């Protein structure tokens, strides 16, 4: 989210954010994932459907939008957290919503080892995220890797973010922004050298 904000500001364009803080079930999910997963996922699904509808109705000709989520992310989280019966119900709701999300011009996937992810989650300081378990982040990271291994709906830039901090380091951010702006079609990999090590 922080990186999406910076990119949108640099490009002077619309920003579409996941509004996790509005989800009344999310804090409970991190305490009790088994019992809170379904309402958490359904809330996010309805929120995304609303956001996409608003986006389509607002400025149809907005040249650039930056978002911190893909609609497909919802399904990935649902598969990871819901029981088989709950996932079936989620799928039925998803189909009924008939969400027609616009295809992105570019997807940026930041990859980092779980230890780095845990450190960054802790640094963000969001109270309910402090309950995130490393095991959950490992499963989530694996699910993202599998998802993006098959992803071919839009150009994809896979960034090794282990050694860079584009949110808090201006040189790292500029390096990444330059790479985003020069990204071509298809799948590309970016393995930057952190600025302070150069």
Stretches with model-predicted labels:
Residues 20-23, 71-73, 112-117, 163-166:
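Conserved nucleotide-binding/hydrolysis micro-motifs of P-loop NTPases
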Residues 36-102:
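Glycine-rich phosphate-binding loop used to anchor ATP phosphates in small-molecule kinases
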Residues 1:
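Walker A/P-loop
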Residues 5, 9-47:
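Conserved substrate/cofactor phosphate-moiety recognition/catalytic segment
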Residues 16, 67, 106-108, 157-159:
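Hydrophobic/aromatic beta-strand patches that form the interior of the parallel beta-sheet core
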Residues 122-130, 136-198:
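NTP-dependent small-molecule kinase module
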Residues 32-35, 84, 175-176:
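Short, hinge-like loop/turn segments at secondary-structure boundaries
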Residues 74-145:
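A glycine- and Lys/Arg-enriched "phosphate-lid" helix/loop adjacent to the NTP-binding pocket
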